[in-house]
Amino acid sequence: MDNMSNIKNTTDLFLRKIQTVSIDGRGITGLSSGIEELDKITHGFQEGDLITVAGRPAIGKSSLALSMVKRIAIDHRMPVIYISPSMTGEKIVQRLLSIVCKIPLEHIVSGMLSVEEWENLERGSAALRDSPIYIFDTPGISIDKLEEQVHMFCKQNKAKAVFIDYLQLIQSKGNPNWTRNDEVTEVVCRLKSLAMTLNVPFFILSQTNRPEHKEATDSIYTPKLSDLRDSGTIEDVSDMVMFIHRPEYYQVYQDEYGNDLRDITELYIEKNLTGHRNRIRLKSNYDIASFESVQTQNLSFDSGQASPFGIF
């Protein structure tokens, strides 16, 4: 009964929160992504929420996540935990340096840097070194160990966000007769519970099923919740589900209105408990993992719900 509270206290806390937001004028009640159009849709990522960022392999999930880590931990000095069974700490540092210094990742990995890039790297590495980012790169980490480590570090370091890259690599030591669906269901439910217990937004990166070739090469193809891999529970327990889609990845270079889709990343917000489903287009540079909002003509989202923010 430790979490039982009088509704009066919760109401008073919420009213004070939205009064502060109203004075601020940006309409953001949670953690900013650093992407203006995304913040308009999400109003910031809320404490205790489970946010699923889904897409095909090598589509840009880690790049988007690390760009948010840079915004939260380096620009705003808020502690972040980044859990990656798929990348070593060194690879994460390489990618963060690329983002911070605006130097192509290939230049950093190869060491083939211009004089100006070396100067930028020195400044960027100093900023990264002093940032409150905590990396766990244990391969095959279990959900039990993850819960233990995250709970301890959140309490000790007041972490404001937790990123997990990616969900399908978190191990479950459940019933040996469980299917893969059962294992992922247990992991995602426990992550949602942990997010609520710690009152911190959790971002889980998730793989999706391979789309049919005809679907993927269709200029109006849109990712959908049923694309989530391994468990329908991901959709059920997530407070928000967003898909990353890159038409250019499937050799689609124009949409039906003639808009140029080269270097464009589309974010489809397919589930959003604090607002409508929506989509945005971002001008992206994956050499340095940068994402900027872009104005596009005739972009709409046939979601069955009207967009509260009109056409982007």
Residue ranges and their predicted role:
Residues 1-47, 103, 117-118, 123-132, ...:
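Core recognition of P-loop NTPase motor domains used across DNA-transaction enzymes
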Residues 40, 71-158, 172, 280-282:
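Cytosolic-facing regulatory segments adjacent to core modules
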Residues 57:
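The conserved Walker
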Residues 51-52, 81:
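Short hydrophobic/aromatic beta-strand immediately N-terminal to the Walker A/P-loop
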Residues 143-159, 176-178, 186-198, 210-312:
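C-terminal regions of RecA-like/P-loop NTPase motor modules
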Residues 61:
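Conserved lysine of the Walker
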